[in-house]
């Protein structure tokens, strides 16, 4: 299968790439702007070839294309002949979305739209969207998928918009979309993350007091 993974140099992307490589028979094209993940992160997971935008051609092994999800022409080019798009690239976290709501909206809404459009134009049949628990907002437990969303942050709103576009592209264009609401993902290679779980692990390893606010 031919896979496109946006944000593939991040923690979840690297974990997915390792799993796919272990299965063999997969070609993987990573699109990343390298603001969080790095070439070194990808190299520690696998051997890859970096391909310039002008040299994108047929899928071949693991490739890295350095670029921005807001580049709609690049999205169409990257997704050509893909079997599935895994859209992980995003502006992550509530804090940054409050500091710069416009940047959050552009990355998480327009960036997602660009790759759904790339899927539609290139007849890519499957699209997986990395969402978050943030669209649910502040609700009383038990929490389940059928609860009406009530986002309380720009980040939650932008991820909810992405979910809405995925639903629309499934109903309108028959793209098989899947939305995954990740929450505090952790595992090997995640200690650099700013999530509460990664912070607790770092504090525990350093024999520090675990701080809980609220």
Residue ranges, per PLM feature:
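Active-site loop immediately N-terminal to the catalytic Tyr-X3-Lys motif
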Residues: 101, 189-193
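A conserved pocket-lining segment of Rossmann-fold NAD(P)-dependent short-chain dehydrogenase/reductase
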Residues: 97, 177-189, 199-214
């Amino acid at each position: 299968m031919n896979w496109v993974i946006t944000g593939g140099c991040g923690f979840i992307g690297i974990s997915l790439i390792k799993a796919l490589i272990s299965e063999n028979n997969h070609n993987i094209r990573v699109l990343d702007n390298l603001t969080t993940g790095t070439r070194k992160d990808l190299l520690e997971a696998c051997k890859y070839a970096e391909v310039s935008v002008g040299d994108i051609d047929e899928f071949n092994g693991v490739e890295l294309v350095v670029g921005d999800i807001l580049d709609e022409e690049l999205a169409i080019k990257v997704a050509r002949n893909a079997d599935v798009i895994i859209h992980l690239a995003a502006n992550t976290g509530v804090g940054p979305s409050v500091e710069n709501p416009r940047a959050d909206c552009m990355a998480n809404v327009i960036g997602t739209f660009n790759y759904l459009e790339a899927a539609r134009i290139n007849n890519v049949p499957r699209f997986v969207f990395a969402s978050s628990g943030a669209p649910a907002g502040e609700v009383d437990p038990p929490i389940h998928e059928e609860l009406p969303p009530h986002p309380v942050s720009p980040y939650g709103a932008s991820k909810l918009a992405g979910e809405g576009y995925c639903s629309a592209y499934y109903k309108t264009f028959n793209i098989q979309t899947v939305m995954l609401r990740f929450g505090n993902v952790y595992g090997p290679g995640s200690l650099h993350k700013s999530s509460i779980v990664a912070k607790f692990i770092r504090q525990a390893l350093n024999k520090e007091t675990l701080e809980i606010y609220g």
